[in-house]
């Protein structure tokens, strides 16, 4: 495991103009052990970051720079808040220089390169790094590997909720692995900061719709991790929805209890599994989570319900898709990689109303 440092961690961000990029900036600008040294954007080269994002005035004094101008190999770690394919094109040079990489896109999430190529329509650029130097960045399940890795594939937002919602059940083999359902809702910020008809206010406001029902890129990521936990194939129906809020995610997960597991105390199971996890809150029995209770925080809340004490178990999970579902989780990974307490720079309380 990386040892705690005497100096601040030199951090670069590639792709700092999107929603996950600015969320990284918000969190890292308040991190006591971080020195922001480079924030790249080819389009915004020379523009002060605070001019694009006024909330960062007085906190981030850097200007965006074109990628070729930034000395990324001088950084201790570089975050990629970029489209798929960008991080893997630069990972070889960065890791060769001793710089660690945390990718918030999908380049290092899937270990199966054939699956990656099928879903993302591009060949994998560095399969050797993927196989030998990378780790899937879901800290609560993968601490040892993350601490040693040179490259982290930061999990997708939907996968974070579904995997953590099912992990205690799959680890103990308590549910039918062929009958899993994940009914998930995300705020529109999950679509990114780009001009797109579906994200326009007139399209997204007062509207609720499903998308990606025939196949979503997060499906293979979820199933790959669930199958590791289950020790075999799983059958998952995953349906994402877009809801008219800016940030937040609510996943309702359905699982059928196996006959031999009917006497299990599922509330106690979840409480014990996540005891001591700083960012996972298993709510009291009978409680129901709300997205606003985690807004702008790195917390993920879980509630477990068993209607009528029957054979159907319902796991309800909420998170902020931009924080625990993206930038906050990435900072949590960085903390672990550099021997810091996982909570460093991530103790923000959710904002209300």
UniProtKB/Swiss-Prot annotation:
Its main subcellular localisation, reduced to a broad class, is cytoplasm
Identify the pathway.
Answer: Amino-acid biosynthesis; L-arginine biosynthesis; N(2)-acetyl-L-ornithine from L-glutamate: step 3/4
Pull one GO CC term from this UniProt entry: cytoplasm
Q: What is its EC number?
A: 1.2.1.38
User: Which reaction(s) does its UniProt entry say it catalyses?
Assistant: N-acetyl-L-glutamate 5-semialdehyde + phosphate + NADP(+) = N-acetyl-L-glutamyl 5-phosphate + NADPH + H(+)
**Record PROSITE patterns:** ARGC
Q: Which CDD domains match?
A: AGPR_1_C (cd23934), AGPR_1_N (cd17895)
**What are the recorded GO MF terms, alphabetically?**
N-acetyl-gamma-glutamyl-phosphate reductase activity; NAD binding; NADP+ binding
Localization, UniProt: Cytoplasm
Name any Gene Ontology BP term. Answer: L-arginine biosynthetic process
Q: List the disulfide bonds.
A: none
**What Gene3D superfamilies has UniProt attached to this entry?**
Dihydrodipicolinate Reductase, domain 2, NAD(P)-binding Rossmann-like Domain
- InterPro entries per the record? AGPR_AS, AGPR_type-1, NAD(P)-bd_dom_sf, NAGSA_dehydrogenase, Semialdehyde_DH_NAD-bd
Function as written in the Swiss-Prot or TrEMBL entry:
Catalyzes the NADPH-dependent reduction of N-acetyl-5-glutamyl phosphate to yield N-acetyl-L-glutamate 5-semialdehyde.
Please name the PANTHER family in this protein's record. Answer: N-ACETYL-GAMMA-GLUTAMYL-PHOSPHATE REDUCTASE, CHLOROPLASTIC-RELATED (PTHR32338:SF10), N-ACETYL-GAMMA-GLUTAMYL-PHOSPHATE REDUCTASE, CHLOROPLASTIC-RELATED-RELATED (PTHR32338)
| Annotated protein name in UniProt | N-acetyl-gamma-glutamyl-phosphate reductase
Which organism is this protein's natural source? Bordetella avium (strain 197N)
As recorded in Swiss-Prot or TrEMBL, the protein's gene is named argC
């Amino acid at each position: 495991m990386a040892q705690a440092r005497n100096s601040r961690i030199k951090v670069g961000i590639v792709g700092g103009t999107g929603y996950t990029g600015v969320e990284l900036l918000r969190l890292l600008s308040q991190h006591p052990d971080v020195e922001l040294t480079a924030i790249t954007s080819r389009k915004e080269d020379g523009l002060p970051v605070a001019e694009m994002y006024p909330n960062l005035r007085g906190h981030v004094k850097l200007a965006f720079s074109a990628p070729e101008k930034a000395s990324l190999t001088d950084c201790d770690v570089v975050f990629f808040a970029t489209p798929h394919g960008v991080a893997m094109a630069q990972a070889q040079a960065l890791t060769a220089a001793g710089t660690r990489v945390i990718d918030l896109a999908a380049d290092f999430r899937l270990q199966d390169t054939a699956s990656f190529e099928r879903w993302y329509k591009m060949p994998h650029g560095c399969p050797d790094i993927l196989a030998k130097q990378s780790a899937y960045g879901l800290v609560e399940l993968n601490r040892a590997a993350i601490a040693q890795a040179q490259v982290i594939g930061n999990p997708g937002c939907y996968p974070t909720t579904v995997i953590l919602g099912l992990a205690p059940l799959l680890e103990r083999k308590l549910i039918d692995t062929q009958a899993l359902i994940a009914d998930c809702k995300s705020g529109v910020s999950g679509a990114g900061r780009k001009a797109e008809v579906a994200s326009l206010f007139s399209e997204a406001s007062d509207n609720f719709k499903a998308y990606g029902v025939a196949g979503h890129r997060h499906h293979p990521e979820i199933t790959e991790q669930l199958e590791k936990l289950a020790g075999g194939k799983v059958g998952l129906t995953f349906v994402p929805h877009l809801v008219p809020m800016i940030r937040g995610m609510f996943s309702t997960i359905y699982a059928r209890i196996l006959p031999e597991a009917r006497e299990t105390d599922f509330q106690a199971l979840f409480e014990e599994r996540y005891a001591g996890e700083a960012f996972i809150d298993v709510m009291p029995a009978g409680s129901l989570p709300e997205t606003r209770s985690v807004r702008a925080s790195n917390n993920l809340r879980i509630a477990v319900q068993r209607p009528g004490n029957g054979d159907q178990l319902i796991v309800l999970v909420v998170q902020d898709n931009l924080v625990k579902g993206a930038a906050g989780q990435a900072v949590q990974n960085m903390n672990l990689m550099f021997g810091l307490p996982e909570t460093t720079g991530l103790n923000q309380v959710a904002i209300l109303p």
